[in-house]
Amino acid sequence: MKPTYCGYAAIIGRPNVGKSTLLNQLLGQKISITSRKPQTTRYQILGVKTFKDIQVIYVDTPGLHAGTERTINRYMNRTARGALRDVDAIVFVIEPHWESQDAWVLDNLKEIETPVFLVINKVDKIKNRAELLPLIEKVSSLYAFQKIIPLSAKTGDQVGTLEQAVHQLMPESPFYFPPEQVTDRSDQFMASEIIREKLMRLLGQEIPYSLAVTLIEFRKEEKIIRISAVIWVEKKSQKGIVIGKGGERLKRVGTNARLDMEKWFGKKVFLQLWVKVKSGWADNERLLRELGFEE
């Protein structure tokens, strides 16, 4: 019987470097929400890619970041660090410049023996690739990376190079997931994340970090899925901002989310949204656990 190869690859980096976009590109479909705002990803998400006799389970993590005053930030850092345990490869994503936050992430890797690929993302924004040479020289002196790969997660340029490099590190093993499965997350989780993505894309800089989404109904019928969700905010003033004048903003969120859900589930979706205030939820460990954050 022909052997199969299967293993885990963690995607890490500071917030907003394009980790989730890279995961979606690797999988050939969207399973991790994206926005231009940092810290869009809050939960660890597995993306499964099976190609012939190789299965790679990519682990998309929240962005590692210094400054952990809020309880929710400490939870996200623990989640990201926890993803580094027992993986077969690490994909460390940066932008085409080196920042102090990148150095802080690298410090978290220096005691880990797992091979690390350095991905320089967003190279589609650079006119001349020769501009990357000083950066490549600098990072090469900081750590013995398995390979340094400039790519564009947005366009897909050189993503195949990364994929082939990761394949070479996968150990011989039976597949952990059926070949057709693309994520470990439930339909309910995907629905709540789609709603949160639309909120983050429509709202200002601060409010998205005070938002959470929980489902109170998820019912599959023959021709339609009925979903009811609560959007939690921390302050009464934020509730008005989320709803918008005459309910216009909440209506846009609902429409955009419903259209994405219908693509994901392959059937019609009836979606209802409510906005409620839960003061201090992002600093309350009990409430964070209720919302799906893990120790």
Curated annotation (Swiss-Prot):
PANTHER family: GTPASE ERA (PTHR42698), GTPASE ERA, MITOCHONDRIAL (PTHR42698:SF1)
Protein family according to the UniProt entry: Belongs to the TRAFAC class TrmE-Era-EngA-EngB-Septin-like GTPase superfamily. Era GTPase family.
Protein name in the entry: GTPase Era
Subcellular location, record wording: Cytoplasm; Cell inner membrane
A single BP term in Gene Ontology: ribosomal small subunit assembly
InterPro entries listed in its UniProt record: G_ERA_dom (IPR030388), GTP-bd (IPR006073), GTPase_Era-like (IPR005662), KH_dom-like_a/b (IPR015946), KH_dom_type_2 (IPR004044), KH_sf_prok-type (IPR009019), P-loop_NTPase (IPR027417), Small_GTP-bd (IPR005225)
Residue span of region G3: 60-63
Disulfide bonds: none
GO annotation, cellular component aspect: cytosol; plasma membrane
Function: An essential GTPase that binds both GDP and GTP, with rapid nucleotide exchange. Plays a role in 16S rRNA processing and 30S ribosomal subunit biogenesis and possibly also in cell cycle regulation and energy metabolism.
Region annotation (G4) ranges: 121-124
Pfam families: KH_2 (PF07650), MMR_HSR1 (PF01926)
Chain ranges of the KH type-2 domain: 203-279
Gene Ontology molecular-function annotations: GTP binding; GTPase activity; ribosomal small subunit binding; small ribosomal subunit rRNA binding
Signal peptide as annotated in the record: none
Keywords attached to this entry: Cell inner membrane, Cell membrane, Cytoplasm, GTP-binding, Membrane, Nucleotide-binding, Ribosome biogenesis, RNA-binding, rRNA-binding
Organism the protein comes from: Coxiella burnetii (strain Dugway 5J108-111)
Stored SUPFAM superfamilies: P-loop containing nucleoside triphosphate hydrolases, Prokaryotic type KH domain (KH-domain type II)
Domain of life: Bacteria
Topology of the protein relative to the lipid bilayer: Peripheral membrane protein
Subunit and partners: Monomer.
